[in-house]
């Protein structure tokens, strides 16, 4: 608890509660009283334990909470990372959800981002060969920029949840429209054998075939020209 006061005096902007201390209510309460942002590690904790820790923080008038999903192990084994809990945390809590990574590489961080985490915590080291459990799973300085760029690429890829203007433009170029196979005279009644389907898709779409069959041509029509509804009469 004394360390909490010391951290606040140093001007820290946030205090991180380790997974091992999620039930250390005196420590959590002291951290909450500082009014600083509380980052709550939840490794090996039940959802009830996470909820009770949040309740303690909130009871001190502090709602500036970030909940970290993390897994046991330095480095963590992939089969123990349990990214699925991120979905539950997002459903239950209104606070930002972070992923505190203990795995080697970047792929699990990318997956966590795709699952909707707001923050990713990754440790940095000057030398992975340093004899300590955390160094092997950390990024070296030269890996930091590619890591951040990968995160930004995924964020950009996830930014849209509907067709973009560019999608619609490309869609019309690659889809097909209804054309005549051969030149046909005005008054000809169109049957399916008269038709073919070619790009682009700016004309009558194949799924609108029922608007064409049985209709008559208003004027002579060349196979070079896209068939239009205005070309047809009953």
Per-segment meaning from a language model:
Residues 1-234:
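Catalytic cores and adjacent flexible loops of soluble metabolic enzymes
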């Amino acid at each position: 608890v004394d360390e909490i006061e010391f951290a606040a005096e140093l001007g820290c902007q946030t205090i991180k509660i380790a997974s091992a201390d999620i039930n250390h209510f005196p420590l959590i309460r002291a951290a909450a009283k500082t009014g600083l942002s509380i980052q709550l590690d939840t490794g090996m904790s039940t959802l009830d334990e996470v909820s009770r820790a949040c309740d303690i923080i909130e009871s001190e008038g502090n709602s500036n909470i970030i909940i970290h999903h993390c897994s046991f192990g330095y480095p963590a084994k992939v089969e123990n990372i349990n990214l699925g809990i991120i979905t539950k945390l997002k459903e239950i809590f209104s606070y930002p959800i972070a992923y505190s990574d203990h795995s080697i590489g970047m792929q699990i961080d990318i997956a966590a981002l795709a699952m909707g985490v707001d923050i990713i915590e990754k440790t940095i080291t000057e030398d992975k060969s340093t004899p300590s459990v955390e160094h092997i799973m950390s990024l070296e300085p030269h890996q930091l920029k590619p890591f951040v760029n990968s995160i930004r690429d995924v964020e950009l890829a996830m930014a849209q949840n509907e067709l973009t203007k560019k999608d619609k433009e490309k869609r019309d170029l690659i889809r097909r429209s209804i054309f005549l196979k051969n030149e046909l005279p005005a008054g000809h009644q169109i049957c399916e054998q008269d038709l073919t389907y070619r790009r682009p898709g700016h004309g009558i779409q194949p799924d609108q075939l029922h608007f064409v069959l049985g209709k008559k041509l208003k004027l002579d029509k060349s196979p070079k020209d896209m068939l239009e509804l205005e070309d047809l009469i009953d």
